[in-house]
Amino acid sequence: MVDKFLIETDQNEFQPNLWKNGDSDRLPNRCPETQLNVLVVGAGPSGLMTALECWRKGHNVVKILERSNSPVFTGDVIVIGPSALRAFRHWPDMCAELEKSKMDSIMYYRKHNGELILGPTSLGHNDPEYTAAWKGIPFAAPHQIRKDFYRMLLRQVARVGIRVEYGQRVEKYFDDEAAMLGGVITDQGTIMFADLVVAADANRTRSDLLIAGAHTPSRSSGMSVYRTAFPTERALQDEAFRTRWGDAIEKGISHHEFWMGPGMHLGLFISPEFVAFGLTPRDSFLHEGGNEPIESWEPDVDPEEVTKVLNRVPDWNPVIKSLVKNTQRGSIVHWPLLWRNLRREWTSKSGRVVQAGDAAHSSIPASISGGTLALEDAVTLASCLHLSCSSAGSKGAPLGARIYNLLRYQRVSCVQKMSFVNAEGLSGSSMEDAIKENPESVRVRFPRWLYRHDPEAYVYEKYGQAFAHLVEGTDFENTNLPPGHTFEPWTIEQIHKDMMAGKRVADFLDGDWS
């Protein structure tokens, strides 16, 4: 039996009637109703968290539409940073679940031949000097089990009585300015309206056509990823794996390791329950004649192909080669890391349709912030709508959506640029110098300005200034960016041009990105 990377489950498992809801002891204090009806499209983490935070802020979430026929779980990990986890302090059940399922892991950085560069260590936000600041919020583990985290969100959505309707693929978004409504048309011809429609249905969302007139063109980031996950008991059948990690697994210790070679890196997660790895080669290191990377979760890659990619760089440690070689056939996905240049506008002309999460901005794994940004979006949008609609009702929704866009655009752009710095370091472009001068420099960047951010507090701090900027044209400056940074828009084409000229991305980051 093949271990599936993608698992579909019963669409009725998380229907509200099956879950206890309305228990005031376990639900957040809800803000007074704003009379704003919100329709959410997309039942991924961004859409689910948007629905929850909108409910908490007093908005009426009509329903969530999801194109899949049931909840879909992938079998690996997700990183959620403290800035996103702050919102969970309002949700007792989810806080308890995060505490129960928290899983710390030891992090190591190694050369591809196994030589230790740095470790044991952790993500920067869990360094001892910072952990005191996280009192009252869930522990920001180096990772969350993606399936468990997703199921937690689905359960909470059910508890507050919000229904997810599956098998609802949205083919068109539209504005009805006369009626002051946004709307969607599904592939079944069903038309639905709401005061505000949140497009959280990932990249190539049809909301692009309404907001920008076309989908944002995909550009290669210059990288792709071979990705898989499988039970640890299967990995332990490999003698080399068992010899290296068997004792730690038996003691319940989890490892998160980065193996760094010229032109490629391998991220490896090992826990007592499952093993996951992602090999990220630059396109020039792909095996000629191998499977082209496509945006599909169909696991159709032979481990032999991945081994050939590894062999493009000599001296990989035998334990990594053995792990890849013995991965089960039909369990590896080859996913292209495509880039979509960030658009400034995330709202429709009327402001009644707004994008969130991957629908608004793409990310690559090296940012380790895609999930964090998606949840920050949700918290920010719901809070902006709270302020814009508390007195104006649904009429205030467009302004709230535009202020959300203003508060998020520059921050997201900075996080996106940081992902190229991480990818550059992990792929060994300056590894030798880094090892000699400062091993800490190879550490994946998870900077202070990113993880110290409180998206909800930021809305209440900046809303008045943002309002004046949009309505009266006064100056406005975001402060959720690297200190001292002067923001300028950028494109993937510019990044590639600079890299081709021999420049390092890290060298042209002004301000404090630490």
UniProtKB/Swiss-Prot annotation:
Signal peptide: none annotated. Its cofactor is FAD. Induction: Expression correlates with the formation of the sclerotia and thus the pigment production and is directly regulated by the cluster-specific activator CPUR_05433. Pathway: Pigment biosynthesis. InterPro entries: FAD-bd (IPR002938), FAD-dep_Monooxygenase_BioMet (IPR050493), FAD/NAD-bd_sf (IPR036188). SUPFAM superfamilies: FAD/NAD(P)-binding domain. The keyword Cell membrane does not apply. One of its GO terms (molecular function) is FAD binding. Belongs to the paxM FAD-dependent monooxygenase family. FAD-dependent monooxygenase; part of the ergochrome gene cluster responsible for the typical purple-black color of the ergot sclerotia. The ergochrome gene cluster produces several ergot pigments including the yellow ergochrome secalonic acid and its derivatives, as well as the red anthraquinones endocrocin and clavorubin. The pathway begins with the synthesis of atrochrysone thioester by the polyketide synthase (PKS) CPUR_05437. The atrochrysone carboxyl ACP thioesterase CPUR_05436 then breaks the thioester bond and releases the atrochrysone carboxylic acid from CPUR_05437. This is FAD-dependent monooxygenase CPUR_05423.
